[in-house]
């Protein structure tokens, strides 16, 4: 799949320049971005379930980050706790809508961010249904606690929020570029 995704410049450089997400990166590449987010989240959750069980915590040097296992039965910030099946159904609907939007997005940044967010959303949904803390009990495995940020979170949350941020910034940037006045032809400035 990597050979399919290659082009003359990196995806990051194209995203920074607001390039159109055309033929240079076929659908397989964008789905690969989502799969990368999903698999990396699953791997880190598997590690956390093994390394942080029985209340074990790891303090990262500097004291700002602490790794600890938390079962989150709700959505973001614990919203919806107690209604795990509703949270799962709503999550699935939002992931499908986000995937459709990401597939139709017009810029590299929008597609990149959209597919990262889809992978993150799927990571939490799969965790909610399959994993031991979830295991059809509806919980998501959270394991990263930052002292200045209230909820404990996981890599899927980072992919989801970071992806949405990249997509929104890309959309705003491309919108701004489309609205910018075009200099008259022959104007050397």
Task: Indicate residue ranges for each PLM-predicted region.
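Alpha-helical transmembrane bundles and membrane-interface segments of multipass inner-membrane proteins
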Residues: 1-189
């Amino acid at each position: 799949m990597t050979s399919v995704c290659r082009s003359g410049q990196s995806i990051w450089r194209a995203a920074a320049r607001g390039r159109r997400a055309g033929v240079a990166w076929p659908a397989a590449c964008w789905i690969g971005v989502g799969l990368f987010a999903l698999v990396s989240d699953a791997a880190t959750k598997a590690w956390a379930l093994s390394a942080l069980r029985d209340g074990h915590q790891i303090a990262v040097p500097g004291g700002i980050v602490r790794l600890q296992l938390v079962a989150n039965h709700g959505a973001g910030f614990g919203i919806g706790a107690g209604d795990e099946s509703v949270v799962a159904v709503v999550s699935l609907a939002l992931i499908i809508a986000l995937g459709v939007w990401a597939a139709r997005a017009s810029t590299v940044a929008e597609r990149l961010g959209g597919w990262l967010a889809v992978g993150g959303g799927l990571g939490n949904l799969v965790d909610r249904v399959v994993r031991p803390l979830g295991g059809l009990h509806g919980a998501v495995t959270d394991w990263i606690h930052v002292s200045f940020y209230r909820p404990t979170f996981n890599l899927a949350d980072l992919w989801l929020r970071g992806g949405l941020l990249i997509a929104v910034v890309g959309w705003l940037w491309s919108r701004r570029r489309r609205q910018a006045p075009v200099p008259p032809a022959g104007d050397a400035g």
